[in-house]
Amino acid sequence: MNIIMAGIDYKLAPIDVREGFSFTKAMMKQVYSNILKDTMIYGTVIISTCNRTEIYISCEEDFCVNPFEVLCNAAGIDFTPYEKVHRVKEGDEVIKHLCQLACGVKSQIWGEDQIITQVKNAIAVSREMRAADSYLEVMFRNAIAAAKKVKSTLILNSRENSIVHKALKIIKDQETMNIREILVIGNGEMGRLMTNVLIENGYRATMTLRQYRYHANVIPLNANTVDYSNRYEKMKDCDVVISATLSPHYTVEMENLKKIDKIPKLFIDLAVPRDIDPSIKNLPNIELYDVDGIGADEISKNHAQQLKGIERIIEKYICDYHKWCLFKEGLGCI
């Protein structure tokens, strides 16, 4: 038995390359189904976030296909353009990488907390698809436990060190704009969080709602709402537009935007695949930020020092996983 992984992330490829691996739930179900048709593969887990897509595979020792090629084939994507923009790890390096990932030290924003939830969700979806074998289950369990231990032991980041608060900082830095009214497109988890943070910081925030889901929505306290179909009309009254949806299509299109009498000066796109047509940055006096443009944290001296403490903590969980593997293999010999 062997564990292998491969992935693409913000360090290896820009957003226009990565967004090809943003899967809907229906697509993900089909991808899992296609992967498990290979009898040499025992289990698989796919982590898909705005900054990365990674595939973890439990397989026979002599399985020699590139894991990322496996993912591409299962998703109906040509592997050729991605041959030089992904990384592959095998054996002990896989759980070490996963532990570091879950701790947030491989994130674009150092130490961010959302990745733990994303790792949990990834193994949960794999389990739901009946794609996770016991080796992957235990490996992910140990990585999540390691991340929780790190978070409770070390202070990796402040509340402000998140993509939402990075977006807030961009807004606050626009000193000459006199920003008051902000439109948030999207009422999912990210959209609600962004709306809450804006209101907490004294901005008037309006969040879009889909008409057919009005009664199912949770609306942040003191937030205004507008039907999604009226978003362009609302933009006339706004200084900033932030979009954070899971839509496979643009929520802000160039052609529709040009029809507005008064176009907001600042657009922030928190989605992958992108919500906002990138060509709008060619309009005069328009600023557009996407998840890459919001900026990655540099590895500071403080981060390097923290990394040593993190390595000491996760080593225990890596050892625990190895002990479990030895026990599991020992049972097989009885």
UniProtKB/Swiss-Prot annotation:
Domain remarks: Possesses an unusual extended V-shaped dimeric structure with each monomer consisting of three distinct domains arranged along a curved 'spinal' alpha-helix. The N-terminal catalytic domain specifically recognizes the glutamate moiety of the substrate. The second domain is the NADPH-binding domain, and the third C-terminal domain is responsible for dimerization.
Active site per database record: C50 (nucleophile)
The protein's assembly and partners: Homodimer.
Function field: Catalyzes the NADPH-dependent reduction of glutamyl-tRNA(Glu) to glutamate 1-semialdehyde (GSA).
Gene that this sequence comes from: hemA
UniProt keyword annotation of NADP present: yes
NCBIfam families with a match to the protein in the record: hemA
Pfam families: GlutR_N, Shikimate_DH
Pathway in which the depicted protein is active: Porphyrin-containing compound metabolism; protoporphyrin-IX biosynthesis; 5-aminolevulinate from L-glutamyl-tRNA(Glu): step 1/2
Binding-site residues, substrate: T49, C50, N51, R52, S107, E112, D113, Q114, Q118
Any coiled-coil regions, as ranges: none
Organism from which the protein derives: Alkaliphilus oremlandii (strain OhILAs)
Reaction catalyzed: (S)-4-amino-5-oxopentanoate + tRNA(Glu) + NADP(+) = L-glutamyl-tRNA(Glu) + NADPH + H(+)
Annotated residues for binding of NADP(+): G186, N187, G188, E189, M190, G191
Entry-linked InterPro entries: 4pyrrol_synth_GluRdtase, 4pyrrol_synth_GluRdtase_N, GluRdtase_N_sf, NAD(P)-bd_dom_sf, Shikm_DH/Glu-tRNA_Rdtase
Name of the protein described by the UniProt record: Glutamyl-tRNA reductase
Gene Ontology molecular functions: glutamyl-tRNA reductase activity; NADP binding
Enzyme class: oxidoreductase
GO biological process, one term: protoporphyrinogen IX biosynthetic process from glutamate
Keyword tags: NADP, Oxidoreductase, Porphyrin biosynthesis
Family: Belongs to the glutamyl-tRNA reductase family.
